[in-house]
A protein has these predicted regions:
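Fe(II)/2-oxoglutarate oxygenase catalytic core
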Residues: 1-76, 84-107
Length: 107
């Protein structure tokens, strides 16, 4: 049982935790991946914690996966930072969206 020895790095750490605000009617983040530098590709997981509910808009959308995550207070979203997880932050319509975000990366 457990993860294969090559499935999880022996040494890793979180980057600083960022508080992000997406403003109602104008805050968004266009399609991107979160590997950081393509030369080093140190990041391997993305971590978001939604700090409030957004009734309309504000979703985190993965267009290539046909997946949309609606912001709900206290929900955590964890996904790989690589090119296969292209995503975007849609503009919140009903109210501002607040998230905590960080990345796990290799040391």
């Amino acid at each position: 049982t457990g993860l294969h020895k090559h499935a999880w790095p022996e040494t890793f750490k979180f980057e600083e935790i960022r508080l992000k605000r997406y403003r109602m009617g104008r805050g968004n983040f266009l399609d991107h991946v979160d590997v950081g530098s393509y030369d080093s590709a140190m990041r391997f997981l993305v971590l978001f914690v939604y700090l409030n509910d957004v009734e309309e808009g504000g979703e985190t959308e993965f267009p290539e996966l046909d997946l949309t995550v609606t912001p709900k207070c206290g929900t955590m979203l964890l996904f790989p930072s690589t090119w296969t997880y292209l995503h975007r932050g849609n503009t919140p319509i009903s109210n501002d969206k607040y998230i905590l975000g960080s990345y796990l990366h290799y040391v």
